[in-house]
Structure formats: C-alpha cells, structure tokens
C-alpha cells in the first residue's frame, strides 16, 4: 500500500545512532571518520558509494531535510543550499547557458530581480517579464532560445496567484522547464509538481 506524502515525510529519519535518540540530531561536523585509510580512499574515489565524506557534499541532518521536503512535494529528489537565493541562482546556472532566454513573472522577490537583471546578463542570458494578471500574454514571449519559465505563486511579497496548470501547458508545448518558487505556500498548501511544474524552490526562512 502506497503512503501519503505526509506519512512518508514523518517516517523518513536518519539511521539512529548508538545513543538511541528519538529525533535526528544536528550533525555539526565538516568531515567524517573511517575505519581505515583504505576505506576513506574508496569513499573519496567512488561517487556511487552512499557514504558521507564532507558536509559540503552531504550530511545526515541535511539529507533528512532534503528527503522530507522532497516527499512533501512529491518530488523525485532535492538539493539543499545555504539560502533560498543560492537555490534560485544555482537553478538558473544549472539549466541556463549563454544565449538562453528565461521568461519570468514580474511579481517576484527583489533579489531575484537582481539576479535576472544584473547577474545573468554577464553570462549572456536574457530575460522577459510577464504580468501575472495577464497570463494570456505569456506564450507570445516564447522564443526558440527560451529554456525556462520562472514564477512565484503566491508571489513575495504581493501574494499574486497564477494557474500552474495553464503555465505547464505552455511549457510542455514549447519544451520549457517550469520552475516554481513555492516558499510562501509550502507543500502543506500547494504541491506545484502535481500541476505540472518541473522544479520547485523553497526558502526555509518563510513558513517551513
């Protein structure tokens, strides 16, 4: 029997230590120990091994956080970064290249505007804005080089709402990634992937 996302999130927990803690502790460590130098060498040499080597790459506390959020968002997997803005910037830089075009809602967080208008142009990535109250105009902005459509819904701070299924239809028609900042709604209220989003971004300083 399949479990609801909420049940999966509750059941996901890092392997208990010999201290038999009830909740996952904070693993405040940069590195990890090994039984031998040979074991350490294998861990560093083989990326396929499911073992912690350095907290910048993986950490039990962070791993559980990722798994729980992914379960709540009905997502395949996730990545945790230091801040919400670093998550947004990392997403842009992962999926966009020189010459690409991104369509974005104009009603977005101020720092995201800064990335779109000041940083991405340095790498030859251009953007177009659309009005969330006039979604019928979005498709006219699509170009051959358009690779992504980005939106916050509800937007920060204006709480503008848009139909994600409508956006998903446009993106699938033109083979564009639909990226949704869901930090104001959280997966408790809205799960964008269920409505066709490809990627979901969060800031953990809002309601999570």
Language-model features, listed with the residues they occupy:
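A generic structural signal for short, solvent-exposed coil/turn residues
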Residues: 1-2, 20, 46, 72, ...
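N-terminal start-of-chain detector that recognizes signal peptides
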Residues: 1-2, 50-53, 60, 74-75, ...
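N-terminal "arm"/small-domain region of PLP-dependent enzymes with the aminotransferase-like
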Residues: 1-59, 67
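Short, basic and Ser/Thr-rich N-terminal targeting/leader segments
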Residues: 21-22, 74, 89, 123
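Generic structural signal for well-ordered, non-membrane alpha-helical segments
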Residues: 3, 21, 58-62, 109, ...
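Conserved N-terminal alpha-helix of the aminotransferase class I/II PLP-enzyme fold
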Residues: 36-86, 111-118
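Conserved PLP-enzyme active-site core in the AAT-like
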Residues: 9-14, 79-208
